[in-house]
């Protein structure tokens, strides 16, 4: 008869792990900023020389930079190269596959996944950077449009959040809304 009164403690455990103090949240915001600052330096001409630097060299620069700061990486970072090497009907398709060749070249779109650990807090940041051709002053229009579409998908996803909804239903709703707007959403 008492067995019917037993309930799972999982929600309590998850809530405990998710709970952060105001001080922890301030430290977390600072840690996120540090993470973005490290990525900005990694993607700068201080670290990358197009035609010479490899994506793996940038990965190891990230790891060393974090160690030099007395921090730890949360996971092994990645730096992927996405390259428009062919004339295609859709530039988006050209940038949808990574390449095994690792030397960073002008015209490449770089993507990193990088996280830092400090005081039991962990960041997980993904960021892109475009490597301009000599004399190029702006990102190509097709990349600007692709990022705007990606941001729209993010908005559709977060707009689909709601109390009591499952992750799968939120995902399904966001994907349906994206397709209805003529996007090719992938979450």
Model-found features: residue ranges?
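Active-site neighborhoods and metal-handling regions in enzymes and metal-associated proteins
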Residues: 1-187
